[in-house]
C-alpha cells in the first residue's frame, strides 16, 4: 500500500468546477485530458497501454490497483508482451482509490508506479473513485487537470500530440481531432507465415488482435490508417479499434466504402465497427458516458444466447439507421444498444466489443475464428 504521509498533494480539477484532493502517484507533472472510467477489477496495464485511451485520464473504480505489478515487455514484441496492448502507456494519467507500490507476481517486471515514472505519466491516489465515476456518468463531456502541489499547468510534459498549440488552463476534447496519425503505424509490417493473409488497418490496434490472428494461422499485414487499399493484396480485411470520434477520421470511411463494394471478408472491431457502420450508411451518436468494463452482457440476434464482453467506447450506432442490407447481430442486454451488425449476403461483420478481450472474458473469441473461416 502507499504511504500517503510521504507523498505530495495533488488536485484533480474538473471542467464542471469540482475539485478532488489526493496524493500524487507516478511522475511529477501536470496533465489534462478527457475524464473516462473503467470498472474492471484487473487489466490495468492493458488498459493504460491501449491506444484507444489516448488523450484521456482514466479513473479505475476498483478499490486497489497495482498489486501484481506490470508484466515484462521484451523488445516491443507483441507476440510475447502479454499484459501490454502497445509499447507504451497511452493514457494521459490515472486516478485510483489506492495503489499498491510493490508487485507480487512471477510475471511482474516492475511496480506500477515505477512504470508510470519511467513513462512520465502522473496520477492521483486517495480519491473516492466510485463517487468520481458517478460524477463522470452524470456529466456529459467532462474533462480534467491533474495538478501536483507546486506544479504549474504550463509545464505539462504530456501535451496532446495531435494539437500543435496547447495553452495552459485549456480543456481539450480529443474527439474533435483526427487521432489516427498519432496512434497508427507509420509503415507497413508483415507478421506470421500463414497461408491466409489478413490486412489489418491500424487505427490504434490492440496487440492481442494481432496475436490472435497469428495464433490462428494467419499472415497479417499491418497497414497505416491512410493506406491506399488498392495497393494491398489480402484475403480479408480487419478494421481495428482506436480512439476518438469515427466521424473525424479523414477519408477512412470513404475508403472502407470501396472495400464494401467487393466480396472479400471484412471485420470491424470497436472503432472499426463504427467505421464500417458509417460506410454502410448508418449514423453514429455519442453515448452519455460510454461502456468501459469487462462485464458488458450482449445477446446474439436472433436468439437469446448471451456473452460477456470487454468494451471501451464512447460512441454507438443509431439502431434506426442500420442499412436494409445489414442486420443487427448483437444487442447490449443492459441498454439495448447496437453491439454488432452483419451483412445479409456478403462476408462483412463488425462488433462494438472486443472479441480479443485482453483484458476481459474470452466468450466471443470465436468471432475471429468465424472471420478467418470465411477467408
Q: Where are each of the predicted segments found?
A:
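A glycine-centered loop/beta-turn motif at secondary-structure junctions
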Residues: 338-375
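Catalytic beta-strand/loop cores that center a nucleophilic Ser/Cys/Thr
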Residues: 305-346
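Proline-centered loop/turn at the N-terminus of a beta-strand
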Residues: 122, 197, 265-267, 283, ...
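RNA-binding accessory domains that recognize and position tRNA/RNA substrates
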Residues: 1-224, 246, 260, 358, ...
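ATP-dependent adenylate-forming carboxylate-activation enzymes
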Residues: 223-230, 289
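Cysteine-nucleophile active-site neighborhood
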Residues: 241-319, 360-370
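Short acidic/histidine-rich motifs immediately flanking catalytic phosphotransfer sites
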Residues: 232-237
